[in-house]
A protein has these predicted regions:
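Bacterial Sec-type N-terminal signal peptides, specifically the leucine/valine-rich hydrophobic h-region
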Residues: 29-30
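Mid-length scaffold segments of soluble, non-membrane domains
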Residues: 89-168
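Post-signal peptide N-terminal segment of mature Sec-exported envelope proteins
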Residues: 40-71, 88
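Beta-rich strand-turn-strand
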Residues: 84-86
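A structured, mid-to-C-terminal "fold-capping" secondary-structure block
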Residues: 37, 145, 149-263
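Bacterial N-terminal signal peptides that target proteins for export
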Residues: 2-21
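Membrane interface segments of multi-pass transport proteins and intramembrane proteases
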Residues: 62, 67-78, 133-135, 144
């Protein structure tokens, strides 16, 4: 299989983002740019984001969710697991690179070992035999996490058309991933489109139970999903040990001793 050259990838990325912008325009025209009286500091574009969220939810309800439900109903569980594992195995090299960029040498080596074992003895990743070996459990690292590790702030929360929750930092990392992703950059158009569609459906099928819980438990699914996403990304950047938030300032403290008393 031949992969597209960098200029071709850049052009494809440009096309993808133009499609996203067009979808965003449709979302805004359909639902209007709702305004929020007091937006959260972490979500200053909440009105904008809610419009995109509504658009994504409409697309998901009309297309993705029914297709994913049918996929889960028709395709046997071992086959679905194989498909999911293959796509996960493809991402191991990108994860290993980001581990290296974060200075996690041992984790990078373990991820490369996972890729080698699953690609050979696991039939191109269909079987995740590496997870049965102590120390070779999967660890997902991406460029958004790497940028966070380097000290880049996440920036405002964003909802991307079709792709969902993100931040300015994560969106920047995701753009680079699109350019380097071997699935979306395969030269054979039919194979590329089929693999991309299958990956979307496979991932959506994995989230069916979670989406049902979200719909049933959250009074405001948008806020619930936003807060869960931001907390999850914070934990991922700091490997499960995020720094404690500074306590709010106490304005009731007494004045310093050297402050002259008021007469």
């Amino acid at each position: 299989m031949r992969f597209r050259s960098l200029p071709e990838r850049t052009a494809a990325l440009r096309t993808t983002w133009w499609c996203a912008v067009l979808a965003l325009g449709v979302a805004l025209c359909a639902s209007g740019c709702s305004t929020v009286q007091t937006p959260s500091p972490k979500d200053p574009y909440e009105g904008f984001n809610r419009s995109v969220y509504k658009f994504n939810d409409t697309v998901d309800t009309a297309v993705l969710k029914p297709v994913a439900t049918g996929y889960k109903t028709v395709v046997p569980s071992p086959v679905r697991t194989c498909v999911s594992n293959v796509f996960s195995n493809v991402g191991e090299l990108w994860s290993a690179l980001n581990s290296a960029l974060q200075g996690k040498g041992e984790e990078c080596a373990n991820t490369l070992m996972r890729f080698a074992l699953n690609s050979t003895f696991g039939f191109a990743g269909c079987l995740d035999i590496a997870s049965e070996i102590p120390g070779l459990q999967q660890r997902n690292e991406d460029l958004g996490q790497t940028l966070g590790k380097w000290g880049m702030a996440p920036g405002p929360y964003l909802v991307l058309p079709f792709f969902g929750p993100s931040t300015v930092r994560d969106a920047a990392g995701f753009s680079v991933e699109l350019v380097t992703d071997p699935v979306t950059n395969a030269d054979n158009v039919r194979a590329r489109n089929s693999a991309t569609a299958l990956r979307f459906v496979s991932r959506r099928a994995e989230l069916l139970d979670a989406s049902r819980i979200l719909e049933g438990a959250a009074l405001d699914p948008y806020s619930f999903l936003r807060d869960a996403y931001l907390q999850r990304r914070l934990n991922q950047v700091y490997d499960g040990e995020p720094p404690d938030e500074p306590p709010p300032p106490n304005y009731d403290d007494q004045a310093p001793a050297d402050t002259p008393a008021t007469k």
